[in-house]
């Protein structure tokens, strides 16, 4: 072969290899940044009942207005009949001295919240004064949940929690909400999930790669369900089925009484978000930058919407719209049927925590420590507050309670 042919052969080989590298690189990029899959409102889409349409009795709501992370068993983050709108006056504020990574629950005239440095507080809802405080030697990075006159708080690994030892023990502690006295505890791996009580069963996930169902009367596990990786997000419940996700890139639906698998579905990266159940669908964000909609009964992928950044945020739902934030610094209102964008809002900072919808206003915070209240129909900015970082807002029928970075606020709607 002549020298010229050698050169041409080498050039051709380089071009082929270069093309192969380019294709491989494109495939890797696509896997890490998958695109949008548009859905349809004609497939597995139930519109006969809005989230919150089957409400709890009024006397129960007055007693326990915000019982769990995400407000209800379906984690819809929409509270019907809570007519509290901006502008607000700060009625009280309370320093906690440590990060509030997850929002409080509200019951019995008190606001219950855990701090990252292991303190669990009961705060008077009207005055902001501490009623009691219980200190643990473990970090807290999850909301509590209310049962029948018992409040359950998850605990992570021992201090310093930043070491995150994978084999460390964690607990869910049952506490008397009136006195703060510990009633009993259940040991598992590290518990970062916000638990849920349905009937006599307490559900939560753990870093030991399992979902647990614990009988609150016997304090024993009724069943456990193994996954392929850590379970960091909380479960949701609807129609006898428990829905949850794992860091093994999967969403699971299991029989809530037996733990038997009904279906599983996959994403292309980790699921940190807690699922939201509405309209016959399961809505959940993924660190691949997409929001997914799966069929509640089938597990079929119905749509996936790319947001341009990680989606750690759990979703809120209201009036056939899915509300969710992204690390792309944008907050989205998506059509629950198709996944199409109804509107989006440039928040100026990455969004990690979950939104809340109250009286037509959707609230969320950015990692820049700013909270927004937007018109949920149009995306118009109605209100801002210079604190808040993760999932900021819960409420009762008199006030909004805002979890700031290291402060808790009681906000009263302005008269008129």
Name each region found by the language model.
Residues 1-17:
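N-terminal Sec-pathway targeting helices
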Residues 28-52:
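Ser/Thr/Pro/Gly-rich low-complexity linker/stalk segments immediately outside membranes or between
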Residues 25-31, 60-71, 97-119, 138-172, ...:
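Repeat-blade elements of multi-bladed beta-propeller folds
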Residues 124-128, 176-179, 215-219, 255-259, ...:
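Short loop/turn segments that connect beta-strands within beta-propeller blades
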Residues 91, 129-132, 181-184, 220-223, ...:
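A structural motif specific to WD40 beta-propellers
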Residues 53-90:
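Blade/loop signatures of beta-propeller domains
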Residues 18-28, 41-43, 72-74, 82, ...:
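Short, C-terminally biased terminal segments at protein or domain edges
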Residues 93-95:
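Short amphipathic
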